[in-house]
Amino acid sequence: MIVTLTANPAIDRNVTVDRLVFEDRAYILSTRKAAGGRGINASCVIRAFGADTLAIAPCGGKSGKLLEEFLSSCGFAFELVRVRNEIRTNMTVADRNGLAIKLNEKGPELTATEVGRLEKTVRQHLKSASWPLLCGSLPPGVPADFYARLIHAASKQGVKTLLDADGEEFDAALDERPTVVTPNQQEAERLLNRVLLTRNHFQEAAERIRGMGAGSVVLSLGARGAMAALEDGSILEAVPPRVEALCPIGAGDALAAAYAWSLRRNPDPVDALRWGVAAGTASARLPGVSFASLDQTREVYQRVTTRRIA
């Protein structure tokens, strides 16, 4: 079973408008709410691909009750850790041309006791996890080494980990050598404090992040695909077909989920990278924040090209 942790879940309000233009009005075409957060999104993809998954997240307030209602209809197992404060609400606004903006709240302040309960819950499921996916931002009150502690605990039990995080918590977790990390371009730029513009930049970034402690690095590059620096020292590139992207937000979550799903079936990182890029690309073709089915992803997978750079 693939276990996902969403340390800072949300109710996602996804709004589609006719067009997004700076300092001009836009008309709402549709709106919907859903359970959100990187780990929850990953569990949605894994479930759509026919695999078992358990989603773990804190949950509090009226928004937390709504989160539980949404998760109950998702078709996968979940375990919620009760917290006092209201979980956050995030908003995504996208137009029909693929332009999108995401507005995120910081999330609820967690007490030390609540943080301890959340950590204990994840630790209890490590032994049964084929892959724990540690995903997203940490809410206020959660120490920056939270993911690092979980990766350390998993490593002691011989459990492989995938980290999809940003900022200080990403940096701190690298010291514990996560098996795979999946930063996007902006997250890699923040970590390395440099702008990445060219293929050489992407390759150098992936290699540098691997050198900081990650076993393998999958650098998500949106419409350009992904660059991977693997544990054996090889560098891979995966390029998707050209598609009309309606909403790229959430594509990175789909990539991380499909990468872990593929490795669980077949320990071939080349094939996993191909599936990951296919899942991200197929999901970006859908309106709003949506995730492609296995059949939709397979159609794109057949057109993703991979090659070894080094």
Question: What label would you give each PLM region?
Answer:
Residues D24, A48-A129, E299-A310:
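Conserved N-terminal subdomain of the carbohydrate kinase-like
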Residues R47, S155, R264:
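Gly/Ala-rich phosphate-binding loop of Rossmann-like dinucleotide-binding domains
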Residues S128-P139:
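Short acidic, glycine-rich surface-loop motifs adjacent to enzyme active sites
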Residues A144-S234:
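Conserved phosphate/ATP/ADP-binding segment of small-molecule kinases
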